[in-house]
Amino acid sequence: MISFMRTKSRSIKCTLSENVLVSFGENDYNLDAEFVDTDYFSIFSFPTFIGDSAKPMPDQNSVAITEEVSKKLFGTTNGLGKIVRLQIGKEEKPFTVSGILKNIPNNSSINFEIAIPFTTHWDYKEYVDAWDSRNHPVYVQLEEGVTTSQFEKSTVDFTLLHNEEQINNMKRDGAQPDVNGNYAQLKLLPSTDMHFANFNAETLQVKRTFPYLVLGIAFLIVFI
């Protein structure tokens, strides 16, 4: 059995934002949706207007929406318990509104109008066992005392197991291992660095130079 270094909470999966058609009565809106695990809100804090702030989306048949969306759909900010219809791929499915979130500020790193259970995404069944799938970020909260390097080291065997074919192809094509002898490695990126990260030849790099350069030029212009 291969196991990771213990984490404070299990990994939280989150797709890139999708537009989802949400209907109630005669009202239809294309909303900015985020497909997340039901315990997503145990790591990220989104103030709740109505409902359980720790678990505003308690099961796979529930969704959480913002005050603004509730007002648009139902004519009131208290839409708790109402049934909405969501276009999930080619199917229309009913969901219960179990949480009303306060409107998310525009400058938030994570911004959406409706949160939907991750397992209901139209591609979930196709890719649930595809370990090389990279279409969504995965967030991990480490247990207190566990360092990033310790966690990454604990994932080496897991990476080898689930990426064997890819690694063999890399070796065949002449790829060189990193300083630790790894051809593929799971790496963690601190959330504070997410806006400074980019991939160069499939290697994650964090560069803060450009934003600070722009900021410096702005200050120079102001003082001139």
Locate the predicted segments by residue:
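Short amphipathic beta-strand/extended segments in non-transmembrane regions
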Residues: 1-49, 162-169
